[in-house]
Every structure is written in structure tokens, then in C-alpha cells.
Amino acid sequence: MKNKNKRLLVMAGGTGGHVFPGLAVAKQLQSEGWEIRWLGTEDRMEADLVPKHGIEIDFIKVKGLRGQGLKKLLIAPFQIIGAILQAKKHIQAWQPDVVLGMGGYVSGPGGIAAWLSGIPVVLHEQNAVAGLTNQWLSKIAKRVFQAFPGAFPNADVVGNPVREDVCQLPHPSERFAERNGPIRVLIMGGSQGARILNATLPEVLPKLNHSVEIWHQAGKGNQETVNNAYKDNGITDAKVTEFIDDVAAAYAWADVLVCRSGALTVSEVSAAGVGSVFIPFMHKDRQQALNADHLVQCGAAKMIEQQDLTVQSLVDTLNGLERPKLLEMACNARNAAIIDADVRVATAIKSLAK
């Protein structure tokens, strides 16, 4: 007898960029009475993270093909077939109404297994350049969504799910209303830190033609080194931390953010309403540069690609950003934000459930 509650199987793994948006959609549907289960891999972050959110997870064995040697490539077809069969077994045992693919290696076999089982597949691509798995699955999916324009020619642009505390920040015009004094520069390099930001910013900020307050999130194990770099350049009052526990508070504090342009960061910055200088991670398909491009085009951000980054290029960029300009950029960022991605994807999933 079929369970009266609708069921969603989420396929996402490998990185937070895939897992966190999947959790956001899952939570939205859970609040509407849906049952949620997850398909992932045992050796990646979803194995620990997903159960902490009260969601049961099944595992399949699958790895990426890029960078593999000839021997592994030769046996890869057999491994993929095996992963599809594993996924199909889990799917037929639980019988979801819809399967949601958020990217990562696990989505490929899982999506094919769902299709073979006659279960509708919904895709969400977080980046401006579609991952290989989502490129394949887009041909069999019932609905395809993208966070930024350009990943797919005809997919609906719905943004990325953004945490609620960021979406609820006051409008930039309110935050800037009583603000004066030094420009507040927030540097964020992610949990591991961004080596190029840690090396460059302590040299850049003393050369600016206006005074600044600095909050530099340096990443695990980098706090002392970065702090010393600021001191070596004559800055003794920089706030250097390994992590930022309350990201929303950091966005609210900042006049300008200097950071990479991963998909979720770009979406958060837009929702928060903060003017940014993006230094995209170098990748052959320019994924991070393309993530940032729509905010650059709408006047919400500046971008310096890593191959063009020098101390002087960043000095010149930041020197042109006085507070009135930063308020304008922040308002443009907020105006460009899409903050209901989880609701939009959840609505599509509900429409496909029989």
C-alpha cells in the first residue's frame, strides 16, 4: 500500500555547494508534510551532515571520472552500471514520488535509476556553468532549474537557496544611514581560506587613499600568519579570524566584501545587499567568474580575475569605492536577489507528484 505522504529523494553530494541547497529544498517540503530521504556517498560530507538534519541517507559507491588513469577509466563503465543498480535498489525499496538532483557524482547514477524506474527527475544547477552530471541528466529531467542565467539555454532562473538570517537583514539604505568613518572591508576566503586573498590583502589595504576597518576571515590554521602579515605592513588593529560563526552579522557590518565567487557566496551576497569585489578561483571553464558576472553587469560588484590580480589592481579598484558608491552597489545587489529558490523548486516538485 502506497504511503499517503508524498516522498522526495534528494541526490546531492561531495561539497556544501550541492548539499546545502538540497537541504533547503528538503526542509521546505518537510514543513509541508513530505517525507525526505537522501542518496549520497559514504566518504563525502553528506554522510555526516545530512543525518544531523534528521534525514535518513542511503549510500552508493561512485567516483568522478576526471583525472583518472587509463586503468580506472577502462573499468569505469562497470562501476557506473553498478552504481545505477545500487541506486535503483534504494529507489524501488523506498518508492519516492519525485527525485531531486542537486549535482555531485551521486546524481548521475541516481538520476538514471529514477528515470529507469519511471520516477520524475527535477534538477537544480547552482553554478553559471552546468556540471557534467547535470548536463547529462538535463536530457531526461522533467524540470531543470538554474541559479544564474547561462547554465542551460531554456531553464528557469530561480537563484540558490539562501539562509533565512541573511535574507532578513535590513535594507542597505537602513544599514548605511548612520554609518560614517573608515570604510569597513570584509575579506572572506571560505573555511580553508583563500591563499591569494591572505597573501594580497595585507599589502593592499595600507596603500588605500582612505582609512579602513578590516575583518579578515583567513581560514583554518591561517590566523597567526595573516595577522602577522598585517602587522608587517603597519596595520595593528585588523580583526583576523579563522572562521565567522555569524555570517549574516558580518555582511551587515561590511561596507564592501572581498571574496571568491562560489555559487552560494554570490547568492548570499546579493540577498544580503553588499557591494563586492570578486576574485574568482581560476578554473578552465571560468565557472566562478561567470557566477559573479550578473552582479558585475548590474552594478553590484567589481571583478578582478586571478590572472589579472596584482596589489596595484586591487588598490585601484578599492580606491574607487567610497561609501556612497558602495551603498549604490549594495542596493543593486539586493535588487538582483532571488530569495525564494527553495519555494520555487519545491513548488515544481509538488506539481510532478502523482
Curated annotation (Swiss-Prot):
- The enzyme's E.C. designation: 2.4.1.227
The protein's annotated pathway: Cell wall biogenesis; peptidoglycan biosynthesis
User: Membrane topology per the record?
Assistant: Peripheral membrane protein
Which GO biological process annotations does it have? carbohydrate metabolic process; cell division; cell wall organization; lipid glycosylation; peptidoglycan biosynthetic process; regulation of cell shape
Highest taxon listed in the record's lineage: Bacteria
Keyword Nucleotide-binding found: no
Its keywords, alphabetically, are:
Cell cycle, Cell division, Cell inner membrane, Cell membrane, Cell shape, Cell wall biogenesis/degradation, Glycosyltransferase, Membrane, Peptidoglycan synthesis, Transferase
A Pfam family cross-referenced in the UniProt record is Glyco_tran_28_C
User: Catalyzes what?
Assistant: di-trans,octa-cis-undecaprenyl diphospho-N-acetyl-alpha-D-muramoyl-L-alanyl-D-glutamyl-meso-2,6-diaminopimeloyl-D-alanyl-D-alanine + UDP-N-acetyl-alpha-D-glucosamine = di-trans,octa-cis-undecaprenyl diphospho-[N-acetyl-alpha-D-glucosaminyl-(1->4)]-N-acetyl-alpha-D-muramoyl-L-alanyl-D-glutamyl-meso-2,6-diaminopimeloyl-D-alanyl-D-alanine + UDP + H(+)
Where is this chain primarily localised? membrane
Can you list the GO cellular component terms from the UniProt entry? plasma membrane
Q: Which amino acids does the record list as binding UDP-N-acetyl-alpha-D-glucosamine?
A: 15-17, 127, 163, 191, 244, 263-268, 288
Compartment(s) of residence: Cell inner membrane
SUPFAM superfamilies reported in the protein's UniProt record: UDP-Glycosyltransferase/glycogen phosphorylase (SSF53756)
Molecular function (GO) terms for this protein are: UDP-N-acetyl-D-glucosamine:N-acetylmuramoyl-L-alanyl-D-glutamyl-meso-2,6-diaminopimelyl-D-alanyl-D-alanine-diphosphoundecaprenol 4-beta-N-acetylglucosaminlytransferase activity; undecaprenyldiphospho-muramoylpentapeptide beta-N-acetylglucosaminyltransferase activity
Which class of enzymes does this protein belong to? transferase
* Known function: Cell wall formation. Catalyzes the transfer of a GlcNAc subunit on undecaprenyl-pyrophosphoryl-MurNAc-pentapeptide (lipid intermediate I) to form undecaprenyl-pyrophosphoryl-MurNAc-(pentapeptide)GlcNAc (lipid intermediate II).
Give the matching PANTHER family: GLYCOSYLTRANSFERASE (PTHR21015:SF22), UDP-N-ACETYLGLUCOSAMINE--N-ACETYLMURAMYL-(PENTAPEPTIDE) PYROPHOSPHORYL-UNDECAPRENOL N-ACETYLGLUCOSAMINE TRANSFERASE 1 (PTHR21015)
Family note: Belongs to the glycosyltransferase 28 family. MurG subfamily.
Q: Which NCBIfam families match?
A: murG
The identity of this protein, by name, is: UDP-N-acetylglucosamine--N-acetylmuramyl-(pentapeptide) pyrophosphoryl-undecaprenol N-acetylglucosamine transferase
Q: Which organism is it from?
A: Aliivibrio salmonicida (strain LFI1238)
- What are the top taxonomic ranks of the organism? Bacteria, Pseudomonadati, Pseudomonadota, Gammaproteobacteria, Vibrionales
The protein's gene is named: murG
